[in-house]
Amino acid sequence: MHPEKIALTQTVQKGGCAAKVAATTLHRILQQVRFPAAHSALMVDGRYFDDAAIYKINEQTALVQTLDFFTPIVDTPRLFGEIAAANAISDVYAMGGRPVTAMGILAFPLATLSEHIIVDVLQGASDKIAEAGANFVGGHSIDDDTLKFGLSVTGLVNPQQVWTNANAQSGDHLVLTKALGTGTLTAGIKRQQLQEKDIMDALESMAAINNVIDYLSPDLLAAIHAATDITGFGFSGHAMQLANASNVTLSIATGNLPRFDKAFYCLKNSFLTKAHRTNAEYTTPHIDDAKLDALYKLLIHDPQTSGGLLLSVVPEASQLVLQALRTYFKPAAIVGTVHPRQDKAVQFE
């Protein structure tokens, strides 16, 4: 069967980061697991739901380790590979690091899909890994009923320059680098109400690597107190995790949140995923969204795939950071401020 004749999204029930296990379910499971005591060299582990682990090698070098994979979110195999790779690599950038190696994680239904499809998926991933300056060094594959692909990525970072989601400080400005809405837009593709050509802005955004470190001077990099990437738990979920880890409250100017052109159209037409509901269940007790209309309430819970970075920046540097990032991240915007901890983790204005 010729690969161009197969719409990959029609071969799976859920696509992209919308296929994540619901956060409340995942937390309940993990609470029942006895993990060993953390090694003294482990700078960042899973306690604060950060984007990657950090393991200190010496005073100059630490390892950044992460893993991400999912089912197809688009119909084109090569584009799927690019997006899956960009999404996995993003976790390294969210910690302030640089990716150095990547290993593929592949499940593939050999009985129903042509080998040419996986060649294209792997080529897309390989191209994106090379763009990030890393090396594609191998991986593992299994014959499975559903196509799944992603990467295990290792990066390097100076231990003194690590970003985490636990250091946002009162007074900081919040910068978001990419627009929101990939969950509802790709749900439109899966429902065959949209074609890829209708949402090219979102597809290009998902395939773009979050290499903010390449666009900021050392002084501006040092002005970033905390960071996280916005993915499957939506803007609301990842903002809440950053606020909780940092013991602060985020005030979000919701009207400043960048969104893709057709995002509200898709939300109005109920192109939704299960993750819209589970993300709302996860965050609603901990956020104040009373001032938002129905569409914005859906948008903040929209599960992002390969979404942007949310950066907590020294206020004096936020405009300079924004100006530098807009060279590559054109939708980037200042979307809120950080305040001392209040009753709710995130307040949407």
UniProtKB/Swiss-Prot annotation:
Record-listed Mg(2+) binding positions: D51, D91, D229
UniProt entry tagged with the keyword Transferase: yes
One annotated GO molecular function: ATP binding
Binding sites annotated in the UniProt record for ATP: K20, Y48, F49, D50, D68, D91, G139, H140, S141
Keywords from the named record: ATP-binding, Kinase, Magnesium, Metal-binding, Nucleotide-binding, Selenium, Transferase
Cofactor(s) for this UniProt protein: Mg(2+)
Name of the molecule in the record: Selenide, water dikinase
Species name: Nitrosomonas eutropha (strain DSM 101675 / C91 / Nm57)
Taxonomy of the source species: Bacteria, Pseudomonadati, Pseudomonadota, Betaproteobacteria, Nitrosomonadales
Gene that encodes the chain: selD
